[in-house]
Amino acid sequence: KAHDLITSPVYTLIMARDKFPQPTRSPNELWQTDFTWLKVVHWGWYYLCSILDDYSRYILAWQLCIGMSAEEVKQTIEAAIRFTGIRDPKVMSRPRLLSDNGPCYVSKALKEYLEDEGIRHTRGKPYHPMTQGKIERYHRSMKNILLLEHYYSPDELENQIELFVDYYNNHRYHEALNNLTPADVYYGRGPEILTKRKQVKRRTMNLRKRYNLS
């Protein structure tokens, strides 16, 4: 190792009790990814791979898959890369990827792909899914809605996932984000919105004072 004969791993293993040294401070510093499964009547189980931006909780990419292979993970990451434009030469840094230790995430094929893209891989401690808490909560919220219905074709399920992702990203206010939407935070609209809210609140309070004094 002293003579650089042993290379450092492209991934980092974090313990369940560990926290990141510094919370993310901007979009595309850390991406969380995970699979969940959904059933299509008479078709069987399908697997949803999602990628969530840790800072904003914005869903960057998702794919409904027939399995949980490294290739399907790569395809979803590729969609996130294209969406975010991180290959642009002007982008100076790459996000880290946080996942669990499923077979698709520890595969050689994914390791080589991430190395080529300059994306460092962080994996949670085995059997502690709370490490990927944000993506886990997102999938749980999504399934609480989607599982109210039955789906009879993969296309029907995909359409409902697309509708939910749009709702979650653009219309669902999140308490942990100062009651902003993930899109507000991801696209940097948060400060302006919060300032306007304060102004409206101040005007409302002043009107109430005037009314009470009259």
Which residues make up each language-model segment?
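Acidic/histidine-rich, metal-coordinating catalytic segments
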Residues: 77, 88-107, 125-127, 178-183
